[in-house]
Amino acid sequence: MLNVFFLTSLFYAASATTYVTTNNHIEMPIYQKRPLSEQMEMIDILDLGDRPRRQAEPNLHNSASKFLLEVYNEISEDQEPKEVLHQRHKRSLDDDILISNEDRQEIASCNSILTFSSRLKPEQLDNELDMHITFNTNDVPVDLSLVQAMLRIYKQPSLVDRRANFTVSVYRKLDNRQDFSYRILGSVNTTSSQRGWLEFNLTDTLRYWLHNKGLQRRNELRISIGDSQLSTFAAGLVTPQASRTSLEPFIVGYFNGPELLVKIQKLRFKRDLEKRRAGGGSPPPPPPPPVDLYRPPQSCERLNFTVDFKELHMHNWVIAPKKFEAYFCGGGCNFPLGTKMNATNHAIVQTLMHLKQPHLPKPCCVPTVLGAITILRYLNEDIIDLTKYQKAVAKECGCH
């Protein structure tokens, strides 16, 4: 409930433009170019960070992007978990949704999911047996705590059948080592005819990369086929260059971060501190009186409040949704309380007490059912972030 109050009130405070009310619907006007400080205020409220510092246009058709798009669609449509017909380490290509039951458990328990697209190492030679891929882990928010990370490599049927069984191993290149030393991270046994995703636990490795971002721009992994002379290409492993297949290797990381209210409190403290330092230690001036933006209805009900990312000039890095209804509750809780007000027995008693003793407070029109907002955005050209804001939308209102 606090999330709804803070989110709605801060949206009002972020703009000096008057809102228009028609039929209890508060509509955002055509957005005019605002000062940078006001644009950043909107971004900070939704915890979307700064405008991404990307060097190239992100690819929405690779496997990393498609995975998070599938997650977003499942969350947004409130679909029931689908039955997965294959084991976690060997998913079928026929299963268009790349999400397993284990994934859904992590999705339900985390509030941020990030995918990291892979790139082929620039020095990679066509005749090399091993595959060298790199990952960009910059621009990940420092207040996120990693829970689990998985590397996913897609395997097609092998081009040669001289080895019915072989092992795929993943190694991490050690930092600042000139002798090209690698440390093994994990192995998966497979067959020449196998088609599906191979997965490797990369939790400790990704956590190390995130804690040591300054060591190198990109982090390298080496994928090899056991002790054989079989190349990863001949074994059927899809490389980052195989853009037509949309099955490139990628990392998915499940994170937990602080609640939105905690972030807003830290943001306010930081800004108050900056103002005091700029003003020589004097306290900040009192805030301006609140502006009456609308005339509330007579009775408690839910009112619309549309947030449009294009009008906020954020559509270039917010992938989905393009806009959403935040809603808020408004109106009075006056006697008699009708059925449409969803009044509790306590609210009815409190209303009667207020009639007899006016100094006692009346019930308040508040959210009774809360929903979540899910936002999908770029962090840079290689990383996509899905963040869930729990209890941030007023689904129903009532007198409490």
From Swiss-Prot:
Keywords: Cleavage on pair of basic residues, Developmental protein, Differentiation, Disulfide bond, Glycoprotein, Growth factor, Secreted, Signal. GO terms for molecular function: cytokine activity; growth factor activity; protein heterodimerization activity; receptor ligand activity. Residues 17-277 form a propeptide. One of its GO terms (cellular component) is extracellular space. It comes from the Eukaryota. SMART domains: TGFB. Ubiquitously expressed during early stages of embryogenesis, but the effect on development appears graded and is restricted to the dorsal side of the embryo. Its main location: secreted. CDD domains: TGF_beta_BMP5_like. Residues 1-16 form the signal peptide. It is found in: Secreted. Disulfide bonds join 300-365, 329-397, 333-399. PROSITE patterns: TGF_BETA_1 (PS00250), TGF_BETA_2 (PS51362). Glycans are attached at residues 165, 189, 201, 304, 342. One of its GO terms (biological process) is dorsal/ventral pattern formation. It holds the Pfam family TGF_beta. Gene3D superfamilies: 2.60.120.970, Cystine-knot cytokines. Heterodimers of scw/dpp are the active subunit, dpp/dpp homodimers elicit a basal response and scw/scw homodimers alone are ineffective in specifying a dorsal pattern. Part of the signal that specifies dorsal cell fates in the embryo. Acts together with dpp. Belongs to the TGF-beta family. This is Protein screw. The gene is scw.
